Amino acid sequence: MAISIYNDFSDYMLFKGIKNVQTTDFKYKNIDVDITEDLVIKQFDAIYDFHQKSWGFNGYLRNRLNNNTGKIIEEYKIYIKKLVSDINNIKRDEPKNPFEELIIEYGEGAVKRGQACISAVYQTDYIGIISRSMKRNEVCLGNTDFQNLQKENYTYVVSFEHCSYNVVEMDCFILLSKLRRKGAKLDFQRLAREFCYIEGLDTSSSEFITALVSYPHEFMKCCNKYREGKNKDYEDRFYKKLSKALIQDGDSLF
């Protein structure tokens, strides 16, 4: 049996009927517009169509896809360990600025919440989710927001550059997490269930998505940037960002 050869995965998706368009063709260009749950569910239909057309790819790519399965979970675990170390160091040496005072005030809560999210992930059928993904050769679009993906008569995609092998649940997580951090007032647990209904996934998958969406992403990201920053003269800027992160992350979803 002959093996099909493509330069990029986008070439394969075009062959499968996905349309490559410019972002100016899209109705919802701004993620800050009022996003309703019905609109998100419609986006899930577009994501599902992409998934259906990408499942089971066994051709040859000159520019191969990355395999990001499990990557975000491992990154989130590392962020927790680094924040624990930061808290211990700041306590030992005393806070040097308002940013570090915020770390002392809210850091342990962020650690506990992050640990609870990771624990919730492992309480789902996480291994089963990965096994299913590998058997089906699942591919995620990676950028599932309204500026990159839309479905009308056809499914339209602006960029395929973030495509990777990964569990399909991640495409839902990426969308919901971004909407939550933008301040969208949505029932994220219900939306996780709706996505899984459309994709034919079980409750373990919806619980997996909810756990990841609940993770204090912005708090951890801000701490990482402060830790890695070469110029420590921007404490005031980091303080404002961390204060904003507390709002963006919202309350725990479980």
Where are these regions (language model features)?
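ATP-dependent phospho-/nucleotidyl transfer catalytic cores
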Residues: Y28-D34, R64-V139, R190
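Short, hydrophobic/amphipathic alpha-helical patches that form generic packing surfaces
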Residues: D49, K112, T210-E218
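Active-site acidic catalytic loop and adjacent metal/ATP-binding pocket
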Residues: Q123-C172
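ATP/Mg2+ or Mg2+-diphosphate-binding catalytic cores
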Residues: F219-F254
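Active-site activation/catalytic loop segments of kinase-like enzymes and analogous catalytic loops
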Residues: E169-D202, S214-N231
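A glycine-centered beta->alpha junction motif in the catalytic cores
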Residues: I18-V33, Q52-G56, I73, I78-K96, ...
